[in-house]
């Protein structure tokens, strides 16, 4: 079937919206993703070409996660801390000079958004008695948290199967507080910009595995608050808000993310009721389980394997990149990196392989030189200084012979 010219011309914009909304990359959306990547790689839209340059991304190696962790957060930043119309103008302009100027403006807005969110997250955690975050930077926006430190770090992993937004939403092992120490939900009201409360809620839910609600003043004169919600621990937010609807001015969303307006005078009653509802429903759904798609010896992770994995692209929510249990590594080095990550150098029989464990600062203290380990990882490649090398995005580790995860994903169909 020959697609109309306008469909192909607009596919890049449809792709960005699809990925930013964490829509499943299946069916029509998978076609949108494939066509959108082709259009983005063509460089036909000056605004996006300029934004890719600011993000340090090569057009010919773009992945969906580059969109979700680097491009979408930058476009969203214009509306969160500035004027959303600037992002629209960037996408529509045909003037390369205007595109460069707007991309610079949006890049500054994104840096400002990251700093505002960083400070707000520290304030929110302090008010909830949770202590400072191990990584106070804003987390992945497509996971409902907010593009920031993770977003830029992940640009360095230019993988055939880059890390998925769904994987980024999993709680970071080094930062999660044991369940008995936490309330059933994290509910807080503060004085923050409306545009970032969803980022704060997402990061709290991500770090602590509990539903999080963050509210701020929408209209001081009328006493109206606006709140953003992100789910955790199996709580269906849409259902929970229906059970509180008599207290709300309006509400909307789905099971994992929602929002509402409420009169400030009704906030205490809402908070008490929502905490009660959450206490009844926390854990009603079993937590997500890490899965293994393939067990492979370390020496067999090569470019032939990457090419085979690449046939599954584009990968994303609903069509995740394969998890590999890679066996037979020896630790050469494990060191903490900026943003709460751990960088790894792992030896196999013929050479060494680089790895990065996003939001796993605990691994830097757990692993020692000479440790023999197996890893749960996604395999990709990294291009630096004109050279390409294999790199692993490490999700979990275990002592050699004790695989980090043994539950296999059921075959499709």
What are these regions (language model features)?
Residues 245-250, 276-283:
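A common structural junction motif
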Residues 227-228, 258-261, 289-297, 344:
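Short, hydrophobic beta-strand segments
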Residues 76, 309, 377:
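A residue-level signal for conserved active-site and pocket-lining positions in enzyme catalytic cores
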Residues 187-188, 343-348, 356, 392-395:
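Short, acidic/hydrophobic/Gly-rich beta-strand patch recurrent on exposed beta strands
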Residues 351-366:
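Beta-strand/loop nucleic-acid-binding surfaces
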Residues 5-265:
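Hydrophobic helix-and-loop "lid/oligomerization" segment in the mid-to-C-terminal part
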Residues 292-355:
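Accessory interdomain/linker segments of ATP-dependent helicases and helicase-like nucleic-acid enzymes
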Residues 266-271, 363-364, 369-409:
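OB-fold single-stranded nucleic acid-binding module
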């Amino acid at each position: 079937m020959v697609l109309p010219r306008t469909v192909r011309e607009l596919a890049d914009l449809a792709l960005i919206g699809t990925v930013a909304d964490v829509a499943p990359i299946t069916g029509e959306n998978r076609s949108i993703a494939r066509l959108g990547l082709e259009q983005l790689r063509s460089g036909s839209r000056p605004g996006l070409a300029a934004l890719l340059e600011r993000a340090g991304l090569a057009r010919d190696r773009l992945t969906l996660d580059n969109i979700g962790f680097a491009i979408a957060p930058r476009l969203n930043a214009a509306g969160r801390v500035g004027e959303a119309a600037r992002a629209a103008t960037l996408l529509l302009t045909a003037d390369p000079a205007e595109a460069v100027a707007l991309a610079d403006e949006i890049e500054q807005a994104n840096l400002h958004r990251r700093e505002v969110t960083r400070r707000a997250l520290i304030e929110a955690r302090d008010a909830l008695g949770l202590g400072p975050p191990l990584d106070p930077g804003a987390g992945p926006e497509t996971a409902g948290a907010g593009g920031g430190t993770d977003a830029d770090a992940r640009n360095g992993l230019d993988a055939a199967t880059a890390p998925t937004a769904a994987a980024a939403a999993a709680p970071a092992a080094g930062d999660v507080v044991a369940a008995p120490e936490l309330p059933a939900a994290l509910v807080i009201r503060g004085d923050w910009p409306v545009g970032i409360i969803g980022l704060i809620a997402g990061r709290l839910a991500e770090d602590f595995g509990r539903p999080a609600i963050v509210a701020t003043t929408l209209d001081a004169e009328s006493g109206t608050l606006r709140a953003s919600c992100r789910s955790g621990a199996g709580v269906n937010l849409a259902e929970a808000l229906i059970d509180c609807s008599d207290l709300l001015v309006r509400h909307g969303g789905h099971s994992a993310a929602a929002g509402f307006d409420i009169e400030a005078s009704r906030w205490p009653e809402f908070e008490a009721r929502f905490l009660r509802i959450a206490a009844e429903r926390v854990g009603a759904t079993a937590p997500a389980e890490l899965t293994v798609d393939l067990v492979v010896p370390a020496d067999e992770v090569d470019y032939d394997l990457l090419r085979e994995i690449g046939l599954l692209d584009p990968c994303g929510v609903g069509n995740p990149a394969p998890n590999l249990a890679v066996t037979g590594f020896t630790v050469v080095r494990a060191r903490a990196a900026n943003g709460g990550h751990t960088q790894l150098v792992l030896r196999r029989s013929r050479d060494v392989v680089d790895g990065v464990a996003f939001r796993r600062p605990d691994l830097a203290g757990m692993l020692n030189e000479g440790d023999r380990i197996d890893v749960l990882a996604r395999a990709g490649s990294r291009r630096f200084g004109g050279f390409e090398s294999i790199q692993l995005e490490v999700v979990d580790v275990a002592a050699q012979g004790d695989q980090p995860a043994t539950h296999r994903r059921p075959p499709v169909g």
